[in-house]
């Protein structure tokens, strides 16, 4: 799925977070329900940092012998294309601006680390978050929290790169 999102080229950086995070403006939570090499069943939930569920589906694909050729194409690539198309549709119908979601993400991150730092800036009603007002870009606390967020992203990127390397190293075993 990640490769297909990157090929789509509409998303910016695609990261794999080891656990739920408020840093990304958009998350896709995947749960593998079945996977035996022939069948893949995946539940996908797309959420904005607002807490809004933008889409939720269960996807199923059954591979055929022709899917396992020597060209190293993932046998479930068509499933990933369908998932990305559904994500694009869900996101394109949403009303949120990217800058708003980025501000909301920053405030939610700040609220998780230091709840008393910006108590009146973030609103929450019925499980949905909103920006009530924004702190100054020169706010010293916000600057420090943004620096921490950058460090966390660097850590996630390092782990992500290591996982990608391991995946490349073992992938040949799947294409015998």
Where are these regions (language model features)?
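Generic structural signal for short, solvent-exposed loop/turn connectors between secondary structure elements
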Residues: 19-25, 35-40, 71-74
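Acidic helix-start/capping segments at beta-turn-to-alpha-helix junctions
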Residues: 17-32, 103-109
